[in-house]
């Protein structure tokens, strides 16, 4: 599911389509009002991730003259376009020709059918939301399970689509605290929060009490009671302002939200995996893979990129694009160079 994120930057407003789910609502997201140097939050991605070394992108695979142009697409919001551009540049560095026409083609209801029909060959996907698109409620907090279930569905779509390795990077619902609160209360995980919940003011989504992955999940897994919590739109300006203004001590945001990096807030690890895992993975049409001279090398390039990305880094890169207004291609290249994936 996608929610709308609105970043208010001075007099201008950028409306961007966000990646995480808040249980069915469509809300606006945070207003970034400070230019402080970002202090990125720890990754909330699950620990089971692919282990392909980043250097594989440079050392494994390479295009053949017979290989077709790779048509790369993505959903329409900045983070999806950024990941698509990163994958595109990594492929170009290995000699593949890339067509970017479909990057930013639209929301999943547009991009998924477009991939199935062959309008493009490759897109980054949030595996929890991708699974929910085809089978509502099937997504879990286990990225491996989400990947497997999504693959089972996509095998029968569009002549077959392959879900490659998922990244440690994930954009999903997360509970966030100010750094001073984290330090004072020694908070790193949701289990830590549970132990001191009576001492803190918690802000949750407006539908948290009736949302099974919010109120019920927090109560069952952690014993956290949100019945008296402050109800605000998750991933939205009021939640951000309440956390900044200390009206609340804990707020529900999206894990790659630029406000986290801008304010140096701390994402509490969902150590019991109550939230649907939204790790990013490339989806590739099987008919394209069948035309490549080195299918294994091609996949290794994409898997290496995915393995090198994490949630904290994606948050910072997203801030550079959506808050600092840096060009997506420039941000993508700088990160790929920092990892030795491109020169």
Where are these regions (language model features)?
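C-terminal motif of bacterial Sec signal peptides marking the signal peptidase cleavage site
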Residues: 16-19
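Bacterial signal peptide processing site
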Residues: 21-24
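Short, well-ordered beta-strand elements
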Residues: 66-79, 96-103, 198-204
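Short helix-initiation/N-cap motifs at beta->coil->alpha
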Residues: 78, 100-113, 228-241
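Short helices/loops that flank or line small-molecule/ion binding pockets
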Residues: 85-90, 109-120, 216-221, 235-251
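A ligand-binding cleft/hinge motif common to bilobed small-molecule-binding domains
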Residues: 127-139, 146-152, 242-268
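A conserved helix-loop-strand patch within extracytoplasmic ligand-binding domains
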Residues: 143-202, 307-311
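A bilobed periplasmic-binding-protein/Venus flytrap-type ligand-binding module shared by bacterial periplasmic
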Residues: 173-183, 279-294
């Amino acid at each position: 599911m996608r929610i709308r994120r609105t970043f208010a930057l001075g007099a201008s407003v950028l409306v961007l389509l966000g990646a995480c789910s808040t249980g069915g609502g469509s809300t606006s997201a945070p207003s970034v009002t400070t230019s402080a140097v970002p202090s990125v939050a720890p990754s909330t991605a699950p620990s089971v991730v692919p282990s392909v070394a980043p250097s594989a992108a440079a050392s494994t695979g390479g295009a053949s003259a017979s290989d077709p142009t790779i048509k790369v697409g993505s959903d329409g919001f900045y983070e999806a376009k950024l990941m698509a551009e990163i994958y595109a540049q990594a492929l170009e560095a290995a000699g593949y020709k890339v067509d970017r026409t479909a990057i930013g083609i639209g929301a999943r209801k547009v991009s998924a059918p477009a991939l199935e029909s062959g309008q493009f060959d490759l897109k980054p996907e949030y595996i929890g939301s991708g699974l929910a698109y085809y089978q509502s409620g099937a997504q879990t907090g286990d990225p491996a399970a989400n990947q497997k279930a999504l693959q089972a569905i996509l095998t029968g779509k569009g002549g077959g689509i392959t879900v490659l390795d998922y990244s440690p990077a994930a954009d999903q619902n997360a509970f966030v605290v100010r750094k001073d609160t984290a330090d004072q209360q020694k908070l790193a995980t949701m289990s830590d929060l549970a132990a001191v919940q009576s001492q803190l003011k918690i802000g949750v989504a407006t539908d948290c009490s009736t949302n099974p992955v919010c109120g019920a999940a927090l109560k069952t897994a952690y014993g956290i009671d949100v019945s008296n919590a402050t109800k605000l739109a998750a991933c939205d300006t009021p939640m951000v302002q309440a956390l900044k203004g200390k009206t609340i001590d804990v707020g529900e945001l999206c894990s790659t939200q630029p406000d986290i990096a801008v304010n140096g807030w701390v994402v509490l690890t969902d150590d019991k995996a109550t939230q649907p895992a939204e790790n990013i993975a490339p989806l590739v049409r099987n008919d394209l893979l069948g035309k490549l001279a080195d299918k294994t090398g091609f996949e290794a390039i994409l898997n290496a990129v995915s393995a090198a990305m994490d949630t904290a880094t994606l948050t910072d890169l997203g801030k550079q694009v959506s808050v600092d207004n840096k060009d997506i291609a420039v941000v993508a290249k700088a990160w790929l160079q920092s990892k030795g994936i491109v020169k």
